[in-house]
Amino acid sequence: MTESVRLPVARLKPSTVALPGSKSISNRTLLLAALSDNACEIHSLLKSDDTDRMLEALDKLGVQIEYLAEDRLKVHGTGGRFPNRTADLFLGNAGTAFRPLTAALAVLGGDYHLHGVPRMHERPIGDLVDALRIAGADVEYLGKEHYPPLHIGERQDNGERVIPIKGNVSSQFLTALLMALPLTGQAFEIRMVGELISKPYIDITLKLMAQFGVQVINEGYRVFKIPADAHYHAPEHLHVEGDASSASYFLAAGLIAATPVRVTGIGANSIQGDVAFARELEKIGADVVWGENFVEVSRPKERAVQSFDLDANHIPDAAMTLAIVALATGQTCTLRNIGSWRVKETDRIAAMANELRKLGAKVVEEAEAIHITPPETLTPDAVIDTYDDHRMAMCFSLVSLLGVPVVINDPKCTHKTFPTYFDVFSSLTETAE
């Protein structure tokens, strides 16, 4: 039987939340540190299913890792060559581990088997594999063409130095290629084919690579130039920012409940694109205060939450939270340019539409957009399915701030990025039933 949690009608208390470390930054940092020519102590690392899969994989590849505290460890770099050239790697449903490791191992060569949970085998990887093959990599599909699981063999340097890659399905493919190609020591040019989605995630990658000593020239997100003789050299200490996507639930709560909520671990200078979520809240009625290491959202009770029609390509993960905020507006709201939702942990457009309808909302689903019209009164005690998707569970917790209780199935799916989410959420609220 599916485990579930019932959230009663809740009242938000003025609150401060210390965010867990960013998933995107944590897994990129672990891989870059493992490929560096020195040791790196990483602080505030996210403890979650996705980072556990990356750490397990690095261990199987022969990387020495010292666990110093719950959220602090030291990675001893391998100088850009993993000691173990044969490994069977199970990577769960962790795209931030699967895609970058695929590219790094394909560029280095060896005898590797990469696989995950059934949903991971439904998430496309063909655009990345096509690019890696142009660079001489030996990557074989073990099941359906263009999807994991994969076998990786020895790379043959074919002299090709200009690599085209599509960027309209997932920016993680470009991230993976950017992080892997410096391991060759050769100069490369990566050329985008068609539109590149989720550019802020590429900014995270480029900024982290620079912190590890590799400067990539970005020519308008169309061409990326990797210098010859590049190698990774880690900072002695690196602090992982709080997760800006996870911040979205608490910031949205502050707007919905007209109660001040401060999140710490991100701020005005964050390298994560999802901090722009707070700016979107500002446009629809929030008061936002920015600090160096915090963002605070509130709303005067007399000011209504405004409806919106938003191109959300720049904040694909945090935009899911806006689908719940739409219920507080009383008017039709639209999220556009969210086609990447279809190939995430689940088909998030379909999942979001299904579950919003259980609350009484009218939802029109398009290939790359969703239109949400809230009902006069939300349906109480709706049972929300979460599709093994951490963000579905966290988003729908906010319904309890809208005057109705809600039941969330499989709340433990938040272990992917935020294992303590429901404990933290309940600590910020009091029952109003």
From Swiss-Prot:
A biological process term (GO) from this entry: aromatic amino acid family biosynthetic process
Enzyme class: transferase
Pfam family membership, one: EPSP_synthase
InterPro entries named in the record: Enolpyruvate_Tfrase_dom, Enolpyruvate_Tfrase_sf, EPSP_synthase, EPSP_synthase_CS, RNA3'P_cycl/enolpyr_Trfase_a/b
Binding site for 3-phosphoshikimate: K23, S24, R28, S170, S171, Q172, S198, D317, K344
Active site: D317
Presence of keyword Zinc: no
One Gene Ontology CC term in the entry: cytoplasm
Protein location: Cytoplasm
Pathway: Metabolic intermediate biosynthesis; chorismate biosynthesis; chorismate from D-erythrose 4-phosphate and phosphoenolpyruvate: step 6/7
Molecular-function GO terms, alphabetical: 3-phosphoshikimate 1-carboxyvinyltransferase activity
Major localization class: cytoplasm
UniProt EC number: 2.5.1.19
Recorded catalytic activity of this chain's protein: 3-phosphoshikimate + phosphoenolpyruvate = 5-O-(1-carboxyvinyl)-3-phosphoshikimate + phosphate
Keyword tags: Amino-acid biosynthesis, Aromatic amino acid biosynthesis, Cytoplasm, Transferase
Top-level division of the source organism's lineage: Bacteria
Residues reported to bind phosphoenolpyruvate: K23, G95, R123, Q172, R348, R391, K416
Physiological role: Catalyzes the transfer of the enolpyruvyl moiety of phosphoenolpyruvate (PEP) to the 5-hydroxyl of shikimate-3-phosphate (S3P) to produce enolpyruvyl shikimate-3-phosphate and inorganic phosphate.
Family: Belongs to the EPSP synthase family.
Subunit description: Monomer.
Record's protein name: 3-phosphoshikimate 1-carboxyvinyltransferase
Biological source species: Neisseria meningitidis serogroup B (strain ATCC BAA-335 / MC58)
Gene that encodes it: aroA
